[in-house]
């Protein structure tokens, strides 16, 4: 079972964040600076009063290590690990991968030195490359039944825990659209590329001159977004791999591949209505979030990981943000126009070579605790 790539579009509600990103503080003049020096940072406390999880008391005193390649969640992982230790007696040391280092290179070097982490947060491709030789088999773990559609199987076995389910498309600010048009906005009413353009034109006529935020970062415009031409081949990871191999083998001519031309058509639309059209290389990521939250724009070509930026820019959890698909054509029946892309951006692999039985058991319990305990 390959991980599911296309998920049903959520037509209302918050853009929920599964990762926390840091603001750079850079400004390029597109909007006002949202930073308030008097603002207090507030945290939602974790309710630890209810905990029905059954801990294995024989594991108390065990220490395990977790290699973290997702810097945005380092602090959260440390706090969660501390809570787990209070309950279980198992110490979890969260080891960050140095910014700029390759997670794959890091974990391989640790294996070569004979000191691999008990568990490692890695990219899916890293797990596929390493699992059969180095990982513990997780096929029988209880959380597997809860993760159907997001699991990565390697020759019929599960070697990793799916983490950070992230989706992307066109984020909308519902209140901005409704205020500009003077009517309620139903995201389900926009089903094609032409209908999206019609909505954009209506917003322009209503006074929002450039209703789209589109940041300059190459990881967003290239690495994240160009994947659509593969992922929308037939909507699964297997299909994406199939079209990639066909293109590499010369069976499909990329220049005439319909998903590429459709992708570029939509990209041209976003460029036309881009708030930073006059200076696209000055379109700082954080400024795009500010413009969306302030109502200067109504849409942002991005993923759910952008929520912390939008929140920092002034949005609240009570505001209505959501996703529209990245519309590829005018075919209402095309799944690409009905869904957004979503998949686990990271996987947790457990060491099956060096870790002791107790360490493996503690790492497995930690993963189950994340899923099944009220605290986790």
Where are these regions (language model features)?
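Hinge/lid segment of periplasmic solute-binding proteins
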Residues: 40-58, 122-178, 197, 322-324
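Periplasmic solute-binding protein
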Residues: 130-132, 148-188, 197-201, 215-246, ...
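Extracytoplasmic "Venus flytrap"/periplasmic binding protein-like
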Residues: 83-147, 153, 175-185, 290-291, ...
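Short, solvent-exposed loop/beta-turn-alpha elements that line the ligand-binding surface or hinge
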Residues: 136-150, 179, 188-189, 232-262, ...
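Glycine-centered hinge/linker elements that transmit conformational signals in sensory
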Residues: 197-201, 242-281
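Extracytoplasmic/periplasmic substrate-recognition and gating elements
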Residues: 82, 86-87, 91, 96, ...
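Conserved N-terminal structural module of periplasmic/extracytoplasmic solute-binding proteins
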Residues: 11, 26-126
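Sec-dependent N-terminal signal peptides of Gram-positive bacterial secreted proteins and lipoproteins
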Residues: 6-29
């Amino acid at each position: 079972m390959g991980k599911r790539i296309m998920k049903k579009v959520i037509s209302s509600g918050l853009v929920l964040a599964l990762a926390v990103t840091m603001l750079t503080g850079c400004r390029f003049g597109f909007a006002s600076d949202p930073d308030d020096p008097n603002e207090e940072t507030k945290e939602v406390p974790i309710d630890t009063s209810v905990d029905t999880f059954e801990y294995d008391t024989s594991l108390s005193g065990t220490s395990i290590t977790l290699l973290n390649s997702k810097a945005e969640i380092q602090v959260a992982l440390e706090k969660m690990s501390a809570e787990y230790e209070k309950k279980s007696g198992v110490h979890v040391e969260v080891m960050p991968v140095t910014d700029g280092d390759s997670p794959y290179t890091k974990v391989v070097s640790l294996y070569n030195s004979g000191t691999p982490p008990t568990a490692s947060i890695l990219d899916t491709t890293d797990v596929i490359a390493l699992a059969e030789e180095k990982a513990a088999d997780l096929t029988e773990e209880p959380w597997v039944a809860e993760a159907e559609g997001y699991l990565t199987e390697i020759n019929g076995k599960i070697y990793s825990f799916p983490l950070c389910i992230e989706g992307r498309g066109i984020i909308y600010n519902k209140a901005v659209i409704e205020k500009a048009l003077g009517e309620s906005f139903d995201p389900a009413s926009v089903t094609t590329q032409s209908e999206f353009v019609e909505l954009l034109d209506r917003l322009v006529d209503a006074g929002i001159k450039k209703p789209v935020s589109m940041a300059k970062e190459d990881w967003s415009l290239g690495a994240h977004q160009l994947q659509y031409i593969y992922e929308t081949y037939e909507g699964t990871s297997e299909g994406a791999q199939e079209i990639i191999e066909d293109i590499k083998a010369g069976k499909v001519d990329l220049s005439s591949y319909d998903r590429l031309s459709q992708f570029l058509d939509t990209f041209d639309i976003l460029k036309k209505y881009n708030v930073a059209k006059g200076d696209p290389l000055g379109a700082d990521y954080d400024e795009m979030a500010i413009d969306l939250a302030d109502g200067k724009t109504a849409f942002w070509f991005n993923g759910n990981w952008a929520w912390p930026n939008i929140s920092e820019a002034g949005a609240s959890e009570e505001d209505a943000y959501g996703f529209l698909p990245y519309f590829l054509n005018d075919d209402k029946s095309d799944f690409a126009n009905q869904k957004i892309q979503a998949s686990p951006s990271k996987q947790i692999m457990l060491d099956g070579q060096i870790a002791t039985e107790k360490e493996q058991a503690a790492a497995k319990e930690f993963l189950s605790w994340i899923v099944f305990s009220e605290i986790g």
